[in-house]
Structures are given as C-alpha cells and as structure tokens.
Amino acid sequence: ITDHYKNRDVWTTLAVLSLLTNKISLGTGVTNPYTRNAAITASSIASINELSGGRAILGIGPGDKATFDKMGIDWDKPLSRVRETVLAIRAFLAKEQVSQAGFKGAQMSFTTSKIPIYIGAQGPKMLELAGAISDGVLINASHPDDFKFAVPMIHARAEKAGRKPEDVQVCAYASFSADKDPAKAVNASKKVVAFIVAGSPENVLERHGIGMDEARAISEAISRFDFKGAMDGVTTKMTEA
C-alpha cells in the first residue's frame, strides 16, 4: 500500500486489511525515512505483523523530491538515509538498543516474528544498497529491460556483501490497466505513468528513450497539482515502458 500524504493513511489501511484477510502478505509500497521516525515505523510494522499473524513486509525507499518539496521536507542524502533507517529498523525489530542514526539507546518493548525489509529502488546506487542489506528489492517497473539492468547489479552487490543472490528477492511494482476498449485502458493508466516518469532517475528515462525535458514538464505539472496537464504529457512510449 502506498504511503503518500494525499492518500488514505497506509498504517490504518494495513491494520484493517490485516483483520479482513487471511493469507496474502501485507506491506508498505513504499514508506520512506523522512516523514516518520524509524522507531515509529518499526513499531507500526511490528504491530501490523502481529495483527496479520506474521504476514507483514516493510517496503521502504527514498521517496521523491517533488512530494517532499510540497511538504516542506528537505530530501537530503537519500541513499544514506535509507541505509541508516533500514539498519535501525532491523535493530529495533530485534529488540536491540539502537544508538545509530541519531538514536540514543532507544529500544522497543516487544518482539514479533521476522519481518522482511524490501527496498524500493530504481537507480544504480539504491539497487546496489538493496543487494547489500535488504531481504528484497521492489522495482518501480515491469519492463524486461529494467530487470536486465537491475538484477545483475543486485546480485553482484549481494555477493560482494557475502550474501547469496537468491537471498534477495526481486519484485516488480507493476501497474496495469484493463478495459475492453484499449484506448480507455491506456487513458486510465496515464496518471500513474505520469507519477512514475516524474520520479524516475535520468538513467531509467534514457533506457526507455524518454527525454528529460518531457519528464521535467510532467514533474512540474504534478507539482502544480495540474494532473490533467501531467496526463496530457504522457506519451505512448511512456505507457509502454
């Protein structure tokens, strides 16, 4: 479930879903290190894990600058922040005293079963970090070219960290749109595509032949809450990527 200030609260939603479902895994797709303290995030995901009978997954990534600008939050050192937060949360969940990332001996008062931590990643550095420290990687894409690029990088970094590549699960955060009328299906997907394009790093855009000027125009429209303008900027090439 997405963690975005414009949507329903992710933790409330996950709590309700924990009580209304029996088998599916439940998690954040994704939260971030900026809008919540790592100790609170650890407590929240541990609570969801208890409510759901051990079905929780914590998805965490760097978020996007455009959103944080609107919220008045400085998007500083995303790679370091994700790394520090993942390590701190893992320590909290193990009921260890945490004295890193600004904490001073903080500790949770309860434990729960192991919760996998997935890192949301697209760019090379974040993909490598995920290979080094995460239980899984949630890639905001579904095109085969993105995985041809990402998987070898993730596996190489996992091996460098002394891990087995198969210990890091690689997942696609896939978006789809279905309609009997193909044109309607494409049109319905454009808002989601616009947000993905606006939040994609330059190397991802280049891989799919999407110009920086096109992406910048969409990002600027979103920052103005001009969603129609953002959708109008979405091209066929973008929807197919």
Language-model segments: residues:
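Active-site-adjacent structural elements that line small-molecule/cofactor binding pockets in enzymes
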Residues: 1-241
